Regions:
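Residue-level signal for short, function-critical loop segments
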Residues: 125, 144, 182
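Acidic (Asp/Glu) and glycine-rich low-complexity loops/linkers
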Residues: 2-123, 129-141, 150-159, 168, ...
């Protein structure tokens, strides 16, 4: 019996070494465990993003369609509604035997330089970076992810439990709110602006 156990231990060690060598010989490849996508959608005034740990970057651009580009453990799904786009993670379950380069994971949402009514982004642990998007309202909520907004020109509501917030106003919008329970919050106002904080 002991010989049988030793034989299985040797076989397991050889297979583990073979998998490690394969992962080393193919650097940067996820060996089928990551999902990638690059999709285009018509303009919508209402945009909602609901993800777990995927970082979200919103980039304004000169195109005429909304573009979603991503690399993630599970595929992202997009659902078009009445003047709305909802992006979420699919219910597909993925188990990976290999360590992935998670720093290259994330979702990039390219928004045409138009006016939007409402943009809502929710992540559990992903970071959110917002470019100078023009929207009536932008709401971003994370549990532990950081929120960075550059050249903000929209009414915004940013909330995180333990992440950090950097809000850089292009012009101050009355009624904007920032809340971070245990993280840091930094607000940059335009020169010459008059601001009252509550």
């Amino acid at each position: 019996m002991e010989r049988g156990i030793n034989r299985w231990l040797i076989i397991t060690a050889v297979l583990a070494a073979a998998f490690a060598a394969l992962a080393f010989l193919i650097p940067g490849e996820s060996l089928g465990s990551s999902k990638e996508g690059d999709e285009y959608f018509p303009l919508c005034e209402y945009i909602s993003v609901d993800l777990l740990k995927t970082d979200v970057t919103v980039i304004p651009y000169e195109g005429d369609r909304i573009r979603m580009k991503y690399r993630n453990d599970v595929p992202l799904t997009a659902e078009l509604g009445d003047n709305s786009l909802t992006i979420s993670e699919s219910g597909e379950f993925v188990v990976s035997l290999f360590a992935n380069e998670h720093e290259s994971y994330g979702m990039y949402l390219y928004l045409p330089r138009e006016y939007y009514r409402d943009i809502l982004i929710y992540t559990v642990s992903g970071d959110v970076t917002l470019g100078d998007v023009d929207s009536e309202k932008i709401t971003t909520v994370t549990n532990s992810g950081d929120i960075t907004s550059e050249n903000t020109r929209s009414l915004c509501s940013f909330s995180t439990a333990s992440g950090n917030i950097l809000l850089d106003f292009y012009s101050v919008i009355t009624g904007s709110a920032v809340q971070s329970r245990t993280g840091n919050a930094e607000i940059v106002f335009p020169k010459g602006s008059s601001v009252a904080l509550d």
